[in-house]
Amino acid sequence: PDITVVSPVWDSKKKKVIFFVASRGHHTDVGGTTPGSMPPDSSDIHQEGVYIDNFKLVSQGNFREKEIREVLQNAKYPVRSVDINIADLKAQIAACEKGIHEIDLMVKHYGIDVVKAYVNHMHNNAEIIVRNAISKIKEASFCYSMDPDIDGSERKISTSLKVDKLKKSVIIDFSGTTAQL
């Protein structure tokens, strides 16, 4: 299971967020009913591991270790090796701090307007690449039947792709997919 740590990048006056950096880390275990988390026979989200919803890991420059330990250890199905999770989270925070430092260096060297212009250029370029790839997709429908659920009910994934070649856009429709998937 992956955990994503997101940090704001503030302007030089610490008044306005100018960017965000993120670090997504794969954690070997986040609790749940089985080691490694995410068992295939889960019937609710808590069986898959500790549910972390918008938790502030760092406050005023201080890692909130006590509080995150409580979250990880006091869940219905807690993590099995909290010290490993803590070390991984600290590494993710360090990665975000490095990203913030590098962005700060770019802004100091080139100025915020140039850096934002390049970020917008990357976004626009990515959109062009994706739209060109979409224009090559053929309309299609798929239905995949899976093994029955633990209660014996049918499980399937249904997908249809409707491509607008002119707009280079696609609508992905999952109608007909089993609700809990």
Positions of PLM-derived features:
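Alpha-helix capping and helix-loop boundary segments enriched in small/acidic/polar residues
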Residues: 1, 7, 36-43, 80-83, ...
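Short acidic, glycine/serine/threonine-rich loops at helix termini
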Residues: 1-4, 22, 30-36, 153-157
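A short, hydrophobic, proline-anchored segment that marks a local hinge/packing element in signaling
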Residues: 4-12, 22, 162-163
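Structural motif
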Residues: 8, 17-21, 169-171
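Generic structural motif
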Residues: 12, 26-28, 55-60, 147-149, ...
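Gly/Pro-rich active-site capping loops and adjacent beta-alpha segments
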Residues: 16-78, 181
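N-terminal leader/propeptide and maturation segments of large enzyme subunits in energy/redox metabolism
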Residues: 51-130
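Accessory "access/gating" subregions that flank catalytic or transport cores
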Residues: 97-179
